[in-house]
């Protein structure tokens, strides 16, 4: 009898890490693999990144829209409530033997909470990590306490999960999935990257990704972003490649500032809602540095 394993992905970064595991599970004769796509994958302003999953010839079992129509704390809470209700319905329908989740997104926390109430086993990947300035860490540790199996990237993270009270026999240091994700990729040539991005590299190039600091006041985040852009404006000799901030509260003010900056500095600044994993990683090969607070770099 096949084991029914359900994967959940809600963002481009998360899918990039889960991708090889999902593909391997899809062809395993002992596994009946299901996939739920949610979160910013289904958001137009974040590039409808579910299309990248479909390019991998993976057909999602279900798409769960959680109404990402705003970025205020109230909007996030509303999305979390919708997510919990819709995930619970999906879990009752699929009856998985194991739910596999990764990271610290609030929609993943909603899914984990629904699974906990339904007494469904959860395997959590990339727990035990620390994030300053964001409530990601609180969500991540909360998911840890809800989960049954833990797959971490380092011994330090394993120790932290055990310190949280988890049974050492359920915590496994398997390394970071990002290494596996990058290792087998055939990166694009410089010309291919330029074609995909409709962009011409300059003598100096920086990739800029700034996500909201969810535990920092909205006005302070606005001021910090304005200061960063004012500093970048002085460097006309550098070409700046901006990517979309993730779908956390107050992401819209950051995105709007970036878009306005790129519009008024179009000769050396470009904005992309999503580059896709292959183009993004290939782009890193040809730039001089990464600027911002994203772990993707």
Regions found by a protein language model. Give the residues of each.
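Active-site and donor-binding regions of nucleotide-sugar-utilizing enzymes
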Residues: 4-9, 14-26, 66-168
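A nucleotide-sugar donor-handling region in carbohydrate enzymes
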Residues: 8-9, 41-47, 146-221
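Cofactor-binding loop segments of dinucleotide-utilizing enzymes, especially the Rossmann-like FAD-
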Residues: 10, 37-40, 127, 176, ...
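A short, Lys/Arg-enriched amphipathic alpha-helix followed by its capping loop at the start of a domain
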Residues: 21-31, 231-235
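Conserved nucleotide-sugar phosphate-binding/catalytic loop shared by glycosyltransferases and other
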Residues: 31-76, 86
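Short internal beta-strands
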Residues: 34-39, 150, 240-246
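Donor-nucleotide binding loops and adjacent catalytic segments primarily
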Residues: 53, 188-286
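A donor-sugar binding/catalytic signature common to diverse glycosyltransferases
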Residues: 101-102, 109, 124, 150, ...
């Amino acid at each position: 009898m096949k084991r029914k394993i359900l994967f959940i992905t809600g963002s481009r970064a998360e899918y990039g890490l889960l991708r090889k595991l999902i593909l391997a599970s899809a062809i395993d004769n002992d596994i009946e693999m299901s996939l739920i796509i949610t979160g910013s994958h289904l958001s137009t302003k974040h590039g409808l990144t579910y299309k990248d999953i479909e390019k991998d010839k993976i057909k999602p079992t279900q798409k769960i829209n959680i109404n990402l129509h705003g970025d205020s704390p109230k909007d996030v809470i509303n999305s979390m409530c919708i997510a919990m209700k819709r995930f619970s319905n999906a879990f009752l329908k699929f009856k998985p033997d194991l739910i596999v989740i990764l990271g610290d997104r609030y929609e993943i926390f909603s899914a984990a909470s629904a699974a906990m109430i339904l007494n469904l086993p959860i395997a959590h990947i990339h727990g035990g990590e620390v994030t300053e300035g964001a409530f990601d860490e609180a969500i991540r540790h909360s998911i840890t306490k809800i989960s049954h199996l833990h797959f971490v990237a380092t011994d330090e993270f394993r120790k932290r999960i055990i310190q949280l009270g988890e049974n050492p026999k359920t915590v496994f240091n398997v390394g970071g999935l990002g290494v596996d994700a990058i290792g087998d990729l055939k990166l694009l040539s410089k010309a291919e990257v330029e074609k995909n991005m409709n962009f011409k590299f300059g003598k100096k190039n920086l990739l800029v990704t700034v996500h909201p600091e969810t535990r920092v006041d909205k006005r302070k985040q606005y001021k910090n972003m304005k200061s960063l852009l004012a500093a970048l404006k002085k460097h006309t000799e550098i070409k700046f490649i901006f990517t979309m901030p993730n779908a956390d509260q107050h992401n819209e003010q950051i995105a709007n500032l970036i878009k306005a900056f790129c519009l008024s500095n179009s000769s050396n600044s470009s904005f992309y809602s999503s580059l896709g994993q292959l183009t993004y990683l290939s782009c890193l090969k040809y730039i001089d540095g990464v600027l911002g607070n994203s772990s993707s770099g």
